[in-house]
Amino acid sequence: MGKTAFIFPGQGAQKAGMGKDFYEKYDTAKDVFDSAGEWLDLDMKALCFEENDRLDLTEYTQAALVTTCLAMEKVVEEMGLHPDVTAGLSLGEYCAIEAAGGMELKDAVTTVRKRGILMEQAVPAGKGSMAAVMGMETEKIEEVLADIADVSIANYNCPGQIVITGLAEAVAEASEKLKAAGGRRVIPLNVSGPFHSAMLATAGKELGKVLEGVTLHELKIPYVTNVTAEYVEDPAETKALLEKQISSSVRWQQSVENMIRQGVDIFIEIGPGRTLAGFMRKIDRNVKVYNIQTVEDAEKVCQELV
C-alpha cells in the first residue's frame, strides 16, 4: 500500500461561501468555526460564508482560510480518512502542522491571525510586489534574477510556474528581462506585499516572538516544511522554520517530489480551490490527486478510500 498526504492551499484560495456546507452538516466543523470566532473576536460565519470586503485582506484572509481548511480536515478524519504525512503551501503549512498533531487548533488560528497582521504591516503598501513567471526553466529564471538586486524567487510551484517577489521596481525590471529572455508570460499578482522576500525578515522576527508563546507537541505524523522541502519529525524545529518561512522561498515542487520519493501516491487537497491539484498534474501525473472543497467531495473521496 502506498501512502497518503493531506495538502493545504495558501493565501489566494479563499472564496466567499467556503466551508459553509461543512458548518451546516457537521458539528465538528461548526465547533471549529465557532471556536475560532470566539478566540479572535471575529464573526467567522460572516467572514467566510458571505460576500464581504474583508476576506481578501491579509489580516483576515489567513485566519479565515486556516479555520476553513482545518474544519474540513477534521470532518475528513472523522469519516475515517487519515494521512501519513501533511504539507501546506505557505500559510497552509500551519494547517499541515496542526493536522500532524504539532499544534493546537487555537494556537494555529490565533498565530496566523497575528501573522497576517505582521505581514500586512511589514512593508508599506505598493512598495513591494510579486509576479508569476510561466513557461520558463527555473535555472534560466535564477540566472536572470542573479543580476538584479531586491528580487528573488517566492515560490517554486511546479514546472513552468515560478513566482518572484521583492521591491516593486525590481520585480518590474525582472519581469521585463524575463520576458525578453523567453518567459512565455509574466503575470503581476494581486497581493498586498512582497511575500516570501527578504523584505519580510523583520516580520519573521516578530512572528518568532509570537511563536515563543505557543506550545508545540510531539508530531503524530511528519509534515514537510516549505523552507527545505524536508520531512519534519522533531517539533523543536518548527518555530525556527515558521519564522524563516515568511521571508524564504516556498519549495512546493521539491516538497511534493520528496513525498513521492518517500512512497506517497495519494494526495488529498483540502480547502477551497484546486490550485494544488493543478500543480500536481504538472509535477507528476502518475499519482492520484483528490480535491475536497465541499461536503459532497469529502463524502465521495472517503467512500472511495476508507
PLM regions and their residue ranges:
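Cys-dependent protein tyrosine phosphatase-like superfamily
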Residues: 1-2, 213, 217-231, 237, ...
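Short, flexible helix/strand-to-coil boundary loops that buttress conserved ligand/catalytic motifs
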Residues: 48, 145, 175, 280, ...
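Alpha/beta catalytic cores of group-transfer enzymes, especially the acyltransferase/condensing modules
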Residues: 11-13, 40, 100-247
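FabD-like malonyl-/acyl-CoA
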Residues: 2-140, 185, 266-296
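Non-catalytic positions within long, well-ordered alpha-helices that form the structural scaffold/packing
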Residues: 77, 179, 260-261
